[in-house]
């Protein structure tokens, strides 16, 4: 196998480390930050050289799709990943209209989904109304598509104004209560609510 330059070795070692610790490869931006390269095109150039030299394989149709293919592959604990669609944004504060289109695909370790992959999507959280449930501004919530919920479930709901929000769900006698997990905020009371899905997991980039 052809020899690597110092910079290529740094990038290759970083990719291996992230795959070992997280189970999936880093993004181009993360690689650049790790090795001190501000230009994404420069990072892409080094990745192309690594690919030409037979150290990695890439799928240009998917983000983060970097596969280690050197003779050291057996040393790397690679967890199976799935590419989950990121569907717009949903607020965890004052509701905003959800953008019902796929913005990107995000790789997740398969064990985080624990259900049929086609039923899973991700929403980016904006706001602080769920902080006491450990859901912070900027987190990605992993959501299973479903139209029913039980009391106490954390759900993605569409309100009567066709706004999307993440809240804890309660069905009361004559209404629904969408309860924030922030003691400084008031619940939302609704006559009708559409359950879009149940939050089954959380991803946070450290």
UniProtKB/Swiss-Prot annotation:
Group of enzyme by EC: hydrolase
Gene3D superfamilies, alphabetized: Umud Fragment, subunit A (2.10.109.10), Winged helix-like DNA-binding domain superfamily/Winged helix DNA-binding domain (1.10.10.10)
BP GO annotations: DNA repair; DNA replication; negative regulation of DNA-templated transcription; proteolysis; SOS response
DNA-binding region: 28-48
InterPro entries: ArsR-like_HTH, LexA, LexA-like, LexA/Signal_pep-like_sf, LexA_DNA-bd_dom, LexA_repressor, Peptidase_S24_LexA, Peptidase_S24_S26A/B/C
Enzyme Commission numbers on file: 3.4.21.88
Annotated positions for site Cleavage: 92-93
Domain of life from the UniProt record: Bacteria
Pfam hit, one: LexA_DNA_bind
Catalytic activity, reaction form: Hydrolysis of Ala-|-Gly bond in repressor LexA
UniProt keyword terms in alphabetical order: Autocatalytic cleavage, DNA damage, DNA repair, DNA replication, DNA-binding, Hydrolase, Repressor, SOS response, Transcription, Transcription regulation
Subunit structure: Homodimer.
Family in the record: Belongs to the peptidase S24 family.
Protein name per UniProt: LexA repressor
Species lineage: Bacteria, Bacillati, Bacillota, Bacilli, Bacillales
């Amino acid at each position: 196998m052809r020899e690597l330059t110092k910079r290529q070795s740094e990038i290759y070692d970083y990719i291996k480390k992230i795959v070992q610790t997280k189970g999936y490869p880093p993004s181009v931006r993360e690689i650049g930050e790790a090795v001190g390269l501000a230009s994404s095109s420069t990072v892409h150039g080094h990745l192309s050289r690594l690919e030409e030299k037979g150290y990695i394989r890439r799928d240009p149709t998917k983000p983060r799709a970097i596969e280690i293919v050197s003779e050291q592959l057996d040393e790397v604990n690679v967890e199976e990943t799935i590419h989950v669609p990121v569907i717009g944004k949903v607020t965890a504060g004052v509701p905003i209209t959800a953008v019902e289109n796929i913005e990107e695909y995000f790789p997740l370790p398969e064990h985080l989904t624990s259900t049929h992959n086609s039923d899973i999507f991700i929403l980016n959280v904006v706001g602080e109304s769920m902080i006491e449930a450990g859901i912070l501004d900027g987190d990605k919530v992993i959501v299973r598509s479903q139209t029913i919920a039980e009391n106490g479930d954390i759900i993605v709901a569409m309100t009567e104004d066709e706004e999307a929000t993440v809240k804890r769900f309660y069905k009361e006698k004559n209404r629904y209560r969408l309860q924030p997990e922030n003691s400084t905020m008031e619940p939302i009371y609704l006559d009708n609510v559409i359950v879009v899905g149940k939050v089954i997991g959380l991803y946070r980039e450290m």
